């Protein structure tokens, strides 16, 4: 990690109002332009040639604060830097510059992340609990609670490889929402759920926030933003375009999207 970059995790403190502080954050990721090929990789390795890789800027001078006990929704078009932001926040991706201060234990919820296809849904619940350091006596009781919340019925004892995308999402949301993370990062995990289950999850998120937990939610569902979020962050081309009241930020984003659509239609004529 460079001298200009720091990722700091501090113990939760009742006296601090911010769960996450992000200051002038910049990050990039690498994209390989040629198709992966063993012979090409070996030849490049032996000749000390580099693979054809492009560095793509993802975040540029991003600054914001996430209040403790809030639900902050991150919106924007594909490629705006939303998922990259979550990866930086939880420490998966090291930023090039800037500073992140996280006060509390984080859990990243992304469909399929940390799950084992060979295990049943119930076994994956236990695996997640053990990974979070949960005691065995608590885990046994909580497993049944999580299984009931996921609403998978008998499929909870089926191998994960038999699950649909929506079923995986239900299980992942149920596990993450019940392992008592102080900060929960959700990456598009609610996009595939039905209306009833989304309402079910919204109630749980409200309950977590009432306990002082903090949620950062990446989503394309603008209706979810308006109903669930207390703050909204609009990312555009890796920069903060707007931050504040969800209704206001969503309205500005929709106005911009409509103008872009009109410009595109005009250019096509």
Question: Each PLM stretch: what is its role?
Answer:
Residues 228-245, 253:
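H-loop (His-switch) and adjacent beta-strand-loop-beta switch element
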Residues 55, 62, 70-71:
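Conserved N-terminal flank of the Walker A/P-loop in ABC nucleotide-binding domains
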Residues 1-57, 247-266:
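Pre-NBD coupling/linker segments of ABC/ABC-like ATPases
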Residues 21, 27-30, 68-73, 77-131:
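ABC ATPase nucleotide-binding domain signature region
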Residues 52-55, 110-171, 177-179, 185-191, ...:
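ABC-family P-loop ATPase nucleotide-binding domains
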Residues 198-211:
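Helical segment within the ABC ATPase nucleotide-binding domain
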Residues 219-220:
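H-loop/switch region of ABC-family ATPase nucleotide-binding domains
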Residues 93, 190, 233:
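Conserved catalytic/dimer-interface elements of ABC ATPase nucleotide-binding domains
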